[in-house]
Amino acid sequence: MHKAGFVNIVGNPNVGKSTLMNALVGERISIATFKAQTTRHRIMGIYNTDDMQIVFSDTPGVLKPNYKLQESMLNFSTSALADADVLLYVTDVVETPDKHNDFVEKVGHMEAPVLLLINKIDLSNQEKLVELVEAWKELLPKAEIIPISAATKFNVEYVMKRVKELLPDSPPYFDKDQWTDKPARFFVTEIIREKILLYYDKEIPYSVEVVVEQFKEEAKMIHINAVIYVERDSQKGIIIGKQGKALKKVATEARRDLERFFGKTIFLETFVKVDKDWRSSDKELRSFGYQLD
């Protein structure tokens, strides 16, 4: 009998969802940084064996939206509750369980099995962990609570074991040689955006969208033209930097990661353009692939 299902990873920003996703799938599918709101889309990573297919989904962190981009991010997270065969709700040792949290309340009413994963236990002590387990038991009594460390991979194998046990009998949803639902261009944009998140401060990384305008693949080389969109002329100047040095650093570091990702020589050209207030424009958000409804 073949097993298959959707295993969706949800939780607040910066609790380690993307790191967990990469550890479970065994591939670097989601970008992971120390900054909140790194993930903007719902990203699938597909784990295949002869008799099993697990479709993991990494989702944006749950937050109260302040503009339309964040509304779209919340939509991705909420939709992950509806189609989950197994839900992985990720919290960490810093987060305090909140009985007034609407999203947690929705998780509590789910029919699908919920594994509540308390992440980053390598940064805590036993006493604090016991307190958190008891508090979460009270809040989500039906959930199975598992302490983990996605960074050190502590208990990640056990999480995978439980997922396999809970997965329903089903034929595969995707071809067995497919490892994600996203095209190559998507990973180019994410790797460039990751560098911007790492190298720029304050609001700059959150005001950026990356679009691949050309992706031309040859036998040993890929030619890529990418546009970095910002909301203000002042932001454009900051992204480019003095004598173009800041943008050059982003492009150089992104190119190295892209060469590792694709296993080919990368010729990368980057440009910076202003798209005023794109984060609040329905039209622009849809053109960038965000879900608004």
Predicted regions and their residues:
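Conserved G1/Walker A P-loop phosphate-binding module
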Residues: 1-81
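Active-site phosphate-binding and catalytic loops of NTP-dependent enzymes
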Residues: 30-32, 99, 171-175, 198-209
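P-loop NTP-binding site
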Residues: 184-293
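Canonical P-loop GTPase G-domain recognition
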Residues: 113, 122-180
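Conserved glycine(s) of the Walker
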Residues: 16, 155, 246
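Active-site glycine-centered loops adjacent to acidic/histidine catalytic or metal-binding residues
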Residues: 58, 119, 149
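Conserved C-terminal guanine-recognition region of P-loop GTPase G domains, centered on the G4
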Residues: 51, 75-143, 216-218
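Catalytic P-loop NTPase motifs of RecA-like helicase/translocase cores
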Residues: 39, 62-64, 96-97, 124-125, ...
